[in-house]
């Protein structure tokens, strides 16, 4: 099993980051691999049990899709997810956590665990996930960049300057 952890400090409130993270129609605007997100089941009022299909780019113009089950949702603080594989044993899991730092700053923590069991994918697990990890980190940076380029987006969630 492999694990990837990434943390970054971002110049936005946790609430504003959360709002954009929950705005699935916009994921393709900042996440380089994401083409679309389809919400298949909205889950409960907090978002627990949300089931989403993430459609993403693959090399050579191909497309892939991942089913993600979202749990342990705490609004503006984080959630856990499980990527449900077609084959038993290939599920992946991860979490996103937002740590408010005050002054319109938040530390975003991202982690993901994966273990490919099927040939030929398991032979290429290292290179595959190095690529995916770089794309995930880029998505987190571009999430912040997108908010910086769109100051009008949920401006009500920006802390007033003191």
What are these regions (language model features)?
Residues 1-44, 161-162:
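Hydrophobic ligand-binding cavity/cleft-lining segments
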Residues 7-9, 38, 55, 69, ...:
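Generic structural detector for well-ordered beta-strands
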Residues 28-29, 57-107, 113-115, 145-149, ...:
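Hydrophobic-ligand binding "helix-grip"
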Residues 114-162:
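A conserved amphipathic terminal alpha-helix motif
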């Amino acid at each position: 099993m492999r694990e990837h952890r990434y943390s970054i400090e971002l110049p936005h409130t946790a609430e504003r980051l959360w709002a954009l993270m929950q705005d699935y129609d916009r994921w393709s605007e900042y996440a380089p691999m994401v083409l679309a997100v389809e919400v298949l089941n909205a889950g409960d009022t907090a978002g627990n049990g949300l089931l989403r299909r993430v459609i993403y780019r693959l090399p050579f113009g191909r497309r892939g899709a991942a089913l993600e089950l979202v749990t342990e949702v705490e609004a503006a603080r984080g959630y856990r997810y499980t990527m449900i594989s077609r084959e038993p044993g290939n599920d992946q899991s991860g979490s996103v956590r937002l740590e408010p730092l005050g002054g319109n700053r938040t530390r975003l923590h991202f982690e993901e665990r994966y273990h490919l069991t099927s040939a030929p994918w398991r032979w290429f697990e290292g290179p595959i996930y190095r690529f995916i990890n770089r794309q995930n980190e880029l998505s987190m940076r571009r999430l912040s960049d997108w908010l910086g380029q769109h100051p009008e987006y949920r401006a009500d969630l920006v802390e007033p300057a003191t």
